[in-house]
Protein backbone atom coordinates (compact mmCIF):
# COMPACT_ATOMS: atom_id res chain seq x y z
CA UNK A 1 0.00 0.00 0.00
CA UNK A 2 1.51 3.36 -0.95
CA UNK A 3 2.28 5.54 2.01
CA UNK A 4 2.62 9.24 2.62
CA UNK A 5 6.07 10.32 3.72
CA UNK A 6 7.77 13.64 4.11
CA UNK A 7 11.52 13.92 3.89
CA UNK A 8 13.24 16.68 5.77
CA UNK A 9 16.07 18.35 3.85
CA UNK A 10 18.54 16.57 6.15
CA UNK A 11 17.12 13.18 5.15
CA UNK A 12 16.94 13.89 1.43
CA UNK A 13 20.36 12.41 0.76
CA UNK A 14 19.53 11.29 -2.76
CA UNK A 15 18.68 14.76 -4.05
CA UNK A 16 20.01 15.17 -7.60
CA UNK A 17 22.84 17.56 -8.37
CA UNK A 18 21.66 20.86 -9.81
CA UNK A 19 23.28 20.10 -13.18
CA UNK A 20 21.67 16.68 -13.61
CA UNK A 21 18.81 16.34 -16.09
CA UNK A 22 15.14 15.61 -15.39
CA UNK A 23 12.54 14.51 -17.95
CA UNK A 24 9.26 16.46 -17.66
CA UNK A 25 5.91 16.74 -19.41
CA UNK A 26 3.75 19.77 -19.96
CA UNK A 27 2.08 20.82 -16.73
CA UNK A 28 5.08 20.35 -14.43
CA UNK A 29 6.15 24.01 -14.54
CA UNK A 30 2.50 25.07 -14.50
CA UNK A 31 1.92 23.55 -11.05
CA UNK A 32 -0.17 20.51 -11.96
CA UNK A 33 -0.11 17.39 -9.77
CA UNK A 34 2.94 15.32 -10.71
CA UNK A 35 3.53 11.60 -10.96
CA UNK A 36 7.24 10.91 -10.61
CA UNK A 37 9.39 7.83 -11.07
CA UNK A 38 13.16 7.60 -10.57
CA UNK A 39 15.05 5.16 -12.77
CA UNK A 40 18.70 4.14 -12.38
CA UNK A 41 20.44 6.42 -14.87
CA UNK A 42 23.75 7.56 -16.32
CA UNK A 43 25.67 10.15 -14.28
CA UNK A 44 24.38 13.17 -16.25
CA UNK A 45 20.74 12.21 -15.62
CA UNK A 46 18.93 12.43 -12.27
CA UNK A 47 16.74 9.45 -13.18
CA UNK A 48 13.55 11.43 -12.56
CA UNK A 49 10.69 11.35 -15.05
CA UNK A 50 7.93 13.76 -14.02
CA UNK A 51 4.58 13.70 -15.81
CA UNK A 52 1.16 15.26 -15.32
CA UNK A 53 -2.30 14.52 -16.68
CA UNK A 54 -1.32 16.61 -19.70
CA UNK A 55 1.07 13.85 -20.85
CA UNK A 56 -0.54 11.98 -23.74
CA UNK A 57 1.94 9.10 -23.98
CA UNK A 58 3.96 10.63 -26.84
CA UNK A 59 7.58 10.64 -25.64
CA UNK A 60 8.40 13.27 -28.27
CA UNK A 61 6.38 15.76 -26.19
CA UNK A 62 8.66 15.31 -23.15
CA UNK A 63 11.38 17.84 -22.32
CA UNK A 64 14.74 17.40 -20.63
CA UNK A 65 15.65 20.17 -18.17
CA UNK A 66 18.25 20.72 -15.47
CA UNK A 67 17.26 19.84 -11.92
CA UNK A 68 17.83 23.41 -10.75
CA UNK A 69 14.90 24.53 -12.93
CA UNK A 70 12.60 22.07 -11.15
CA UNK A 71 13.92 23.18 -7.74
CA UNK A 72 13.24 26.80 -8.70
CA UNK A 73 9.80 26.44 -10.27
CA UNK A 74 8.45 23.54 -8.15
CA UNK A 75 9.94 23.76 -4.63
CA UNK A 76 6.90 21.77 -3.47
CA UNK A 77 8.45 18.70 -5.14
CA UNK A 78 11.88 18.94 -3.49
CA UNK A 79 11.17 16.45 -0.69
CA UNK A 80 9.93 13.87 -3.20
CA UNK A 81 12.97 14.39 -5.43
CA UNK A 82 15.25 13.28 -2.60
CA UNK A 83 13.88 9.74 -2.91
CA UNK A 84 16.28 7.07 -4.17
CA UNK A 85 16.21 5.17 -7.47
CA UNK A 86 13.18 2.89 -7.66
CA UNK A 87 10.75 5.22 -5.94
CA UNK A 88 7.55 6.65 -7.33
CA UNK A 89 5.37 9.45 -5.99
CA UNK A 90 2.14 11.28 -6.68
CA UNK A 91 2.26 14.88 -5.49
CA UNK A 92 -1.52 15.27 -5.59
CA UNK A 93 -2.01 13.28 -2.39
CA UNK A 94 1.57 12.81 -1.17
CA UNK A 95 1.79 9.06 -1.81
CA UNK A 96 5.21 7.48 -2.28
CA UNK A 97 6.09 3.86 -2.94
CA UNK A 98 9.02 1.70 -3.92
CA UNK A 99 8.89 -0.17 -7.25
CA UNK A 100 11.41 -3.02 -7.38
CA UNK A 101 10.99 -3.44 -11.14
CA UNK A 102 12.06 0.19 -11.65
CA UNK A 103 14.97 -0.18 -9.22
CA UNK A 104 16.22 -3.26 -11.09
CA UNK A 105 16.09 -1.63 -14.54
CA UNK A 106 19.36 -0.97 -16.36
CA UNK A 107 20.64 2.61 -16.67
Identify what each model region corresponds to.
Residues 66-106:
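Short, compact, well-ordered microdomains
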Residues 1-3:
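Fe(II)/2-oxoglutarate
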Residues 62:
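Short, conserved acidic/polar surface loops in the N-terminal third of protein domains
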Residues 5-57, 65-67:
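Short helix/strand-capping turn motifs
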Residues 58-59, 107:
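A short local loop/turn or secondary-structure capping micro-motif enriched for an aromatic residue
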Amino acid sequence: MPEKIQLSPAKAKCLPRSDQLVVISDGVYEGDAVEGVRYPSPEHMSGWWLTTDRYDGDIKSLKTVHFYHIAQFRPDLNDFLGLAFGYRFFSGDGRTWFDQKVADSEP
